[in-house]
């Protein structure tokens, strides 16, 4: 039986903002606000670039990631387009 390929929403979201170099605001669980562009990520951390400097941010410390512009993660279904 072939394995069904599924992607989790976190990876789809982070990949979209990485590929599109979308500016983001990241809020950490301690309230600190970081801003920049996500250049890389894995299961545990991401790299955030701003003004030529790169920060390694651990995902367990992140509360919220807010892109500066709207993000469309999935193609709309035929029913959604016709509505």
Curated annotation (Swiss-Prot):
Signal peptide annotation: none
Residues covered by the Sm domain: 11-71
SUPFAM superfamilies registered for this protein in UniProt: Sm-like ribonucleoproteins
GO MF annotation terms: RNA binding
Pfam entry (one): Hfq
Classification via CDD domains: Hfq (cd01716)
One Gene Ontology CC term in the entry: cytosol
Superkingdom per UniProt: Bacteria
One BP annotation, GO: regulation of DNA-templated transcription
Disulfide-linked positions: none
Keywords: RNA-binding, Stress response
Family: Belongs to the Hfq family.
Job description of the protein: RNA chaperone that binds small regulatory RNA (sRNAs) and mRNAs to facilitate mRNA translational regulation in response to envelope stress, environmental stress and changes in metabolite concentrations. Also binds with high specificity to tRNAs.
SUBUNIT field: Homohexamer.
HAMAP family: Hfq (MF_00436)
Protein name: RNA-binding protein Hfq
Species, as recorded: Rhodospirillum rubrum (strain ATCC 11170 / ATH 1.1.1 / DSM 467 / LMG 4362 / NCIMB 8255 / S1)
């Amino acid at each position: 039986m072939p394995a069904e390929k599924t992607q989790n929403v976190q990876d789809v979201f982070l990949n979209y903002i990485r590929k599109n170099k979308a500016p983001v605001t990241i809020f950490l669980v301690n309230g600190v606000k970081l801003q920049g562009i996500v250049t890389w990520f894995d299961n545990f951390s991401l790299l955030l670039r701003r003004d030529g400097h790169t920060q390694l941010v651990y995902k367990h410390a992140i509360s919220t990631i807010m892109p500066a512009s709207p993000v469309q993660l999935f193609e709309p279904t035929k029913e959604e387009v016709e509505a």
